[in-house]
């Protein structure tokens, strides 16, 4: 039996918000071999955490087939949520440990769905530390936030 080699993809993501809540943006750098693709999107009213999640969802949704992904993000919230917390949230019908509904459930469900086809190695990157791709994602996210064109469907003010 042989194993089909999946494409090795590197993804870098960042989310940004001008005010929290406020206008927000996402920045994505997707790399396959020597090819690099970037994505910048802006949303009218949202939060920083929603942008961190949405950046990863949009990045994974760009992939056309199951891939082996190394995903770099400076968001502990996103990384811990998808690698640790989500299992209990799902068991408890999307309730947090305090018994309240999980914040950003719509995006957590979308992220959970987006990761299923891929093998993902989650890497945390220290933000604003001179990491080239993270800095580029930060710029792309800020550009998006400064020029919002999209509605963050699912955003609910506290």
Curated annotation (Swiss-Prot):
Entry GO MF terms: magnesium ion binding; nucleic acid binding; RNA-DNA hybrid ribonuclease activity
Disulphide-bridged cysteine pairs: none
EC number: 3.1.26.4
Coiled-coil segments: none
Main location (coarse class): cytoplasm
Keyword Cytoplasm set for record: yes
Every RNase H type-1 domain range: 5-146
Subcellular localization, as worded in the UniProt entry: Cytoplasm
Cofactor binding note from Swiss-Prot or TrEMBL: Binds 1 Mg(2+) ion per subunit. May bind a second metal ion at a regulatory site, or after substrate binding.
CC terms in the record's Gene Ontology section: cytoplasm
Binding site for Mg(2+) 2: 14, 138
Annotated positions binding Mg(2+) 1: 14, 52, 74
Cofactor: Mg(2+)
Catalytic activity: Endonucleolytic cleavage to 5'-phosphomonoester
GO BP of this protein: DNA replication, removal of RNA primer
UniProt keywords, alphabetically: Cytoplasm, Endonuclease, Hydrolase, Magnesium, Metal-binding, Nuclease
The keyword ATP-binding belongs to this UniProt entry's keyword annotation: no
InterPro entries documented for this protein: RNase_H, RNaseH-like_sf, RNaseH_domain, RNaseH_sf, RNaseHI
PANTHER family per record: RIBONUCLEASE H1
NCBIfam families referenced in this protein's UniProt entry, alphabetically: PRK00203.1 (NF001236)
Function: Endonuclease that specifically degrades the RNA of RNA-DNA hybrids.
Similarity annotation: Belongs to the RNase H family.
Subunit field text: Monomer.
Full protein name: Ribonuclease H
Organism: Mannheimia succiniciproducens (strain KCTC 0769BP / MBEL55E)
Gene: rnhA
């Amino acid at each position: 039996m042989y194993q089909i080699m999946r494409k090795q993809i590197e993804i870098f993501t960042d989310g940004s918000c001008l005010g929290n809540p406020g206008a927000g943006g996402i920045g994505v750098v997707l790399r396959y071999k020597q090819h690099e693709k970037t994505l910048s999107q802006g949303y009218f009213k949202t939060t920083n955490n929603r942008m961190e999640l949405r950046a990863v969802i949009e990045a994974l949704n760009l992939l056309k087939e199951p891939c082996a992904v190394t995903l770099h993000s400076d968001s502990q919230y996103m990384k811990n949520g998808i690698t640790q917390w989500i299992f209990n949230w799902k068991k408890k019908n999307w309730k947090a440990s305090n018994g309240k509904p999980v914040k950003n459930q719509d995006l957590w469900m979308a992220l959970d769905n987006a990761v299923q086809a891929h093998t993902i190695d989650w890497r945390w990157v220290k933000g604003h530390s001179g990491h080239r791709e993270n800095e580029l994602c930060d710029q792309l996210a800020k550009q998006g936030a400064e020029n919002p064109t999209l509605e963050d469907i699912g955003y609910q003010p506290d």
